[in-house]
């Protein structure tokens, strides 16, 4: 989930609140499977890379599982190493923290939602986006189980209480846009900000509806909730947004574009291979590529099923940025009254990096 960057300030390396760090390639049996799934022959030689010959870079992102899949798959399959990069994947507490780390020089790159990047840019962060790894938002609008038969569309939310992670976040902006599209006055609904843990509040009927992520969405559906709009489904994105809605992607500091050009191209090539691998391998192998620390206690089979269901919709097969999808995010933020809606797209993108 993207988060608001209204309090953006630079963080030095020693100030970053790091939840987890991934680095290197995975064990040999994973790489053998990755090579077979991706039709590669040279990947096995990457099991023991000579790290002294790799260019060390730090890339920070939030810790939402579906956001990190392409990055961890790229790392685990050895595609970063294949491009001469030793990429340290730094897990932070949300997109704003990752962008603060980038803004302050603690990391070289930040992978966040485009909403978060727009908010950061509008608050003075001189960043530029050059690669895309996610083309849909990672949340859906679902009702409480008890109201599934009563609330059958967004228009029925008038006078209801709707849960979002926080006012100003991507899910809040998206919700405001959906209300406007359905002809519902946003002032007629009550927004409850309960962080990202909306599941229990919706399940228990404390909220009439809310913007949820996986696995909460699947769990609510199993209990009878109605899904009004699923941002993770390309068909719903086409119906409600007119197409893809730029989400995860990579940014760096604008002042370093020229000096990092070769490095950025190598990073983009590696991620492009990783995105294609995400579509070609098994969901179980994708789950295997994730650090055990971030799925401890989670249902690995459920996560694999989620990836099988959504990966084709969520993840592109190339890192080239879809400028129309990015403009949709700006338009949604503008409709919601967010500062990100005032950003000129040309000022925050560098599509020439990946051609």
Predicted regions and their residues:
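Short, solvent-exposed loop/beta-turn-alpha elements that line the ligand-binding surface or hinge
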Residues: 82, 149, 233-243, 312-321
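Short, glycine-/small- and polar/acidic-enriched structural segments
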Residues: 4-5, 51-193, 204, 208-214, ...
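Secondary-structure end/capping motifs
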Residues: 257-336
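Small-molecule pocket liners
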Residues: 69, 135-141, 225-226, 246-250, ...
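N-terminal export signals
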Residues: 22-23, 29-50
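N-terminal secretory signal peptides
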Residues: 1-29
């Amino acid at each position: 989930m993207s988060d608001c960057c209204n309090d953006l300030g630079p963080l030095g390396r020693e100030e970053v609140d790091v939840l987890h760090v991934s680095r290197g390639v995975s064990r040999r049996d994973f790489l053998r499977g990755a090579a077979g799934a991706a039709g590669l022959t040279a990947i096995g030689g990457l099991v023991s890379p000579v790290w002294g010959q790799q260019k060390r870079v730090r890339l920070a992102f939030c810790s939402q599982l579906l956001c990190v899949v392409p990055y961890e798959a790229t790392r685990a399959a050895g595609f970063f190493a294949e491009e001469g990069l030793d990429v340290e994947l730094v897990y932070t507490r949300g997109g704003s923290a990752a962008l603060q780390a980038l803004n302050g020089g603690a990391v070289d790159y930040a992978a966040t939602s485009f909403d978060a990047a727009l908010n950061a840019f509008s608050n003075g962060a001189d960043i530029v986006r050059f690669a895309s790894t996610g083309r849909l938002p990672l949340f859906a609008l679902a009702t409480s189980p008890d109201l599934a038969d009563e609330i059958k569309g967004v228009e029925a939310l008038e006078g209801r209480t709707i849960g979002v992670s926080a006012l100003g976040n991507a899910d809040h902006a998206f919700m405001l846009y959906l209300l406007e599209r359905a002809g519902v006055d946003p002032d007629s609904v009550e927004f409850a900000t309960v962080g990202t843990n909306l599941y229990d509040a919706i399940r228990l009927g404390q909220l009439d509806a809310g913007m949820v992520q996986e696995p909460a969405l699947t769990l609510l559906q199993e209990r009878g909730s109605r899904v009004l709009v699923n941002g993770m489904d390309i068909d719903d994105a086409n119906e409600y947004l007119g197409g893809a809605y730029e989400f995860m992607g990579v940014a760096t500091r604008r002042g370093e574009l020229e000096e990092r050009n070769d490095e950025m191209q190598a990073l983009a090539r590696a991620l492009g291979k990783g995105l294609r691998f995400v579509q070609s391998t098994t969901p179980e192998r994708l789950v295997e590529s994730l650090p055990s620390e971030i799925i401890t206690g989670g249902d690995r089979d459920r996560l694999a099923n989620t990836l099988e269901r959504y990966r084709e919709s969520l993840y592109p097969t190339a890192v080239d940025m879809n400028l129309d999808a990015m403009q949709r995010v700006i338009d949604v933020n503008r409709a919601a009254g967010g500062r990100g809606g005032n950003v000129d797209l040309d000022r925050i993108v560098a599509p020439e990096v990946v051609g």
